[in-house]
Amino acid sequence: MICLLIITLLFGILFPVNADSSLYERGRAYFYGDGVEKDYEKALLAFEHAAKTGDLDALTAIGIMHIVAIGVEQNDEKGLEYLNKAANQSHPKAQYYLGAMYYLGIGVPLDLDKAFSWISLSANQNYLFAQHNLAEMYENGKGVTKNLEKAYEYYLIAARKDSVESQIKIAEMYKEGIGTVKNIEKSEYWLKRIEELKGMSQ
């Protein structure tokens, strides 16, 4: 099952730490209660001001807040409007979330072709979650003709960025010779890498 649960992606992914805009940073601070009292309404206001300056991270944040109903009434139509603005300006996170909406049929008719199109654009801009999910779409023939070699290619890209889900897939593909030549040594390498990452997170 493709991992496109937007609510899970809000925290730590939607609002990256290294955003340049001070207005955006102010909104992020209010969203998380970082140095100030947590206040979603003030966060939304700051994001709206940042969006007026052309901040695409802010546009994406506003879109998701409307869709998930954080600090504002739930409004898929308005949320999609903001996501579309950012996605059409080649913002990889917005493209990914928009693809997720089409994949899940949230606020729009379910459309796997459009989901694949947006997620592919995001993946090709090196957005990690899009790369993993694009691999899943290739593996399962969702929105695209099933292609295990392409699935392997994108899983490997994401695995090298320490996506544990992708590493599990790559280990399995090497073990069984799925989408690539069977290679037990490489399978064991990735299984070992997964254990190393688990140890680092403890």
PLM segments and residue spans:
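Canonical positions in the second alpha-helix
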Residues: 49-50, 85-86, 121-122, 157-158, ...
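Terminal, low-structured helical/coil segments at or just beyond the last alpha-helical repeat
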Residues: 168-202
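Structural signature of tandem alpha-helical TPR/SEL1-like repeats
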Residues: 37-46, 73-82, 109-118, 145-154, ...
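N-terminal leader/linker segments that initiate helical-solenoid repeat arrays
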Residues: 14-41, 45, 196
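Short helix-capping/linker turns of helical repeat alpha-solenoids
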Residues: 32-34, 52-55, 68-70, 75, ...
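Hydrophobic face of amphipathic alpha-helices that form TPR/SEL1-like repeat modules
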Residues: 22-32, 46, 61-68, 97-104, ...
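Bacterial N-terminal signal peptides
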Residues: 3-13
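Helix-start (N-cap) detector for alpha-helical repeat units in TPR-like alpha-solenoids
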Residues: 20-23, 56-58, 92-94, 128-130, ...
